[in-house]
Regions:
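Electrostatic, structured charged patches in enzyme active sites and in nucleic-acid/phosphate-binding
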Residues: 1-118
Length: 118
């Protein structure tokens, strides 16, 4: 989940399942886009979909995908270290409720893997 007008480094990538160039703002988003592109059940991918009318501000969902069976899924990419922050939790909850109101219940969070020191 990102602000609608992020002020950070942006990777622009074209993939066959997206109608426009995807703007990616983290390695996690970039890696997950690769996974979505390779997933056979995904028909189309939209990146940074605006959450218009959200009460907490102007934000976007990272990925909205249409599946080949006609259903939709939404994924939010969040670094694991931010999951315990109250603002992150609030924004993720707002996103989940936003999409649920629009009939999309397949909503999930994508996180990075924890690295363990041995």
């Amino acid at each position: 989940m990102m602000r609608k007008d992020p002020k950070c480094k942006c990777e622009k990538r074209a993939v066959t399942k997206a109608n426009s160039v995807c703007r990616l703002y983290s390695r996690l988003q970039s890696a997950y886009l690769d996974i979505l592109q390779k997933t056979d059940s995904i028909e189309t991918i939209q990146c940074n979909v605006p959450l218009d009318g959200l009460s907490v501000g102007a934000y976007t969902s990272d990925f909205l995908c249409k599946c080949k069976d006609g259903s939709f899924l939404v994924r939010e990419c969040v670094e694991r270290k931010f999951l315990a922050k109250p603002m992150t939790v609030s924004l993720l909850d707002a996103s989940r409720k936003f999409w649920k109101k629009r009939g999309i219940s397949n909503w999930g969070i994508v996180t990075n893997q924890e690295k363990t020191d041995v």
